[in-house]
UniProtKB/Swiss-Prot annotation:
Residue positions binding CTP: S13, D146, I147, E148, K186, T187, K188, P189, T190, Q191, K222
Taxonomic lineage: Bacteria, Pseudomonadati, Pseudomonadota, Alphaproteobacteria, Hyphomicrobiales
Active site: C380, H514, E516
Every Glutamine amidotransferase type-1 domain range: 291-541
Organism from which the protein derives: Sinorhizobium medicae (strain WSM419) (Ensifer medicae)
Identification of the protein by name: CTP synthase
Underlying gene: pyrG
């Protein structure tokens, strides 16, 4: 039978509930337990797929094609378990399900209300499909007191009574701010947060307290007394240099022991932390440094590229080097020469994006990388712009463009209207809804033998996650290949280009998919490991 850990947050947002949940999952896994992580998001969007990256951050795509919260990326990176569409739900999805049921008459004429209908829908989501797991960790988005989160709080309160005795534990993540004028850490914000949580009927078993310095024993006793929590269950969560230090730090503070003790599991099996200790050691003791320029459209909010950033760091871990990131807004290169910005970097990465804004800057970045022999990694939109650059400057197709930007006589990149998924043909139209209508999730690709990318993967058959509407037009394949750009990977049916590369370039690869979504600190993605290795070689030349 699965045991449930509910993680809530208080005082302020962005305290790191997702990292805390992921780290706890990793610690329980290290003890041999089977762990599942789920995220409950209070916003009214059905999913984050149509939300602005500069407002919500990255949209994390699962193998089965769900557009989910970026915290699911943390869950995957820390536990190695691939998430599914059933691991994330929003208020919007819950209400949509309920309204659909009401329209079908499933409620048999009953008045549909928050209690019991909304709360039951939430409870069903939390408890379904957990037969194969020992622990289910549920993160509740937002902060205690948010009006949007109230149905979720009520649902997890009810679950405390619905589930068998001793199978639900509540962890509350709070902030203990340091006041310089007083020269001390303050407990009052945490006290008020717990008081508000208790007013909702939820009594936390464990307090996970964020702080930028050691919490004195006297302050722990104070929190224990006023928050009605065992002193041993007041766990300090101190700031660390890397998020991959968090599992070790939480284990040192006894979080996993306290969770298991709250479930009555004593003595608990000892954790195997060697892999995490090796990662932490590699991060602390790099043997070199490389600088990677990220030429993007959403550089104002780094969370828009969360998985990408982490995948680059994973490449650094694989090569025992520190990865320094230079963020460049792509629009800059539409007005200025890229050379002063890019001459000193060791690699250029152009990530995914949508829309015409900044596209010419990305094209100019690709041209600089091609001509100057600087390692270039184009992902999704970054691959498309590299192909447009080749079409214009190598194949002489001056009007080469993407139909995403409007009508064009030379649609080197165009809207996909149909593609094969499994054994079924999927179709889309330009007039269709934006939400959930892209080519989403894991698709297979066939790599051309003897190409650089096939050598990196070590296999001609790969599966990677996609999120795009537009695709390089296969009708231009022969003209582009005659100019030196090799289409090194195609969809199994040979219709959709998946990867491109220049054989005469040290490292120039474009991919239509998002390899960053499958990279892990304990298992770096081969493309990122190879890209950073190429950047390391470049650093010796600059």
């Amino acid at each position: 039978m699965a045991r449930y850990v509910f993680i809530t947050g208080g005082v302020v947002s962005s305290l790191g509930k997702g990292i805390a949940a992921a780290a706890l999952g990793a610690l329980l896994q290290a003890r041999g337990y089977r762990v599942r992580l789920r995220k409950l998001d209070p916003y009214l969007n059905v999913d984050p797929g149509t939300m602005s990256p500069t407002q919500h951050g990255e949209v994390f795509v699962t193998d089965d094609g769900a557009e989910t919260d970026l915290d699911l990326g943390h869950y995957e990176r820390f536990t190695g378990r691939s998430a599914t569409k059933t691991d994330n739900i929003t208020t919007g999805r819950i209400y949509k399900n309920i309204i659909d049921k009401e329209r079908r008459g499933d409620y048999l004429g009953a008045t549909v209300q928050v209690i019991p209908h909304v709360t039951n829908e939430i409870k069903n989501f939390v408890t379904e499909g957990n037969e194969d797991y020992d622990f289910v960790i549920c993160e509740i988005g937002g902060t205690v007191g948010d009006i949007e989160a109230m149905p979720f709080m009520e649902a997890i309160r009810q679950l405390g009574n619905d589930l068998p005795r001793g199978t639900a534990v509540y962890v509350h993540l709070t902030l203990m701010p340091y006041i310089p004028a007083a020269g001390e850490l303050k407990t009052k914000p945490t006290q008020h947060s717990v008081k508000e949580l208790q007013a909702l009927g939820i009594h936390p078993d464990i307090l996970l307290v964020r702080a930028d310095r050691e919490i004195p024993e006297a302050e722990r006793r104070k929190l224990s007394l006023f928050c009605n929590v065992r002193q041993s269950a007041v766990i300090q969560a101190l700031d660390v240099a890397s998020i991959y230090d968090v599992p070790i730090a939480y284990h040192k503070e006894g979080l996993d022991n306290e969770v298991l003790a709250a479930f009555g599991i004593e003595p608990a099996p000892k954790p195997r932390m060697e892999a995490w200790e090796d990662v932490a050691h590699r991060i602390r003791t790099p043997e070199g440094e490389v600088t990677i320029a990220i030429v993007g459209k959403y550089t104002g909010l780094k969370d828009a590229y969360k998985s990408l950033i982490e995948a680059l760091y994973h490449g650094g871990i694989a090569n025992r080097v520190k990865v320094k990131l230079e963020w460049i807004e792509s629009e800059v290169f539409e007005k200025e020469d890229p050379a002063p910005y890019l001459e000193k970097v060791h690699g250029i990465l152009v990530p995914g994006g949508f829309g015409e804004r900044g596209s010419e800057g990305k094209i100019n970045a690709a041209r600089f990388a091609r001509e100057r022999k600087v390692p270039y990694f184009g992902i999704c939109f970054g691959m498309q712009m590299a192909v447009v650059e080749a079409a214009r400057n190598l194949a002489g197709i001056e009007k080469a463009s993407s139909t995403e930007f409007g009508p064009t006589k030379e649609p080197v990149v165009g809207l996909m209207t149909e593609w094969v998924k499994g054994n079924e043909l999927e179709k889309r139209s330009a007039a269709g809804d934006l939400g959930g209508t892209m080519r989403l999730g894991a698709y297979r690709a066939a790599l051309k033998p003897e190409t650089k990318i096939a050598g990196i993967y070590g296999s001609p058959d790969i599966s990677e996650r996609h999120r795009h509407r537009y695709e390089v037009n296969v009708d231009y394949k022969d003209r582009l290949e005659s100019c030196g750009l090799v289409f090194s990977g195609m969809s199994p049916d040979g219709v959709l280009p998946e990867t491109v590369e220049y054989p005469d370039h040290p490292w120039f690869i474009g991919v239509q998919y998002h390899p960053e979504l499958k990279s892990r600190p304990l298992d770096p993605h081969p493309l990122f490991a190879s890209f950073i290795e190429a950047a390391l070689e470049q650093s010796r030349l600059v």
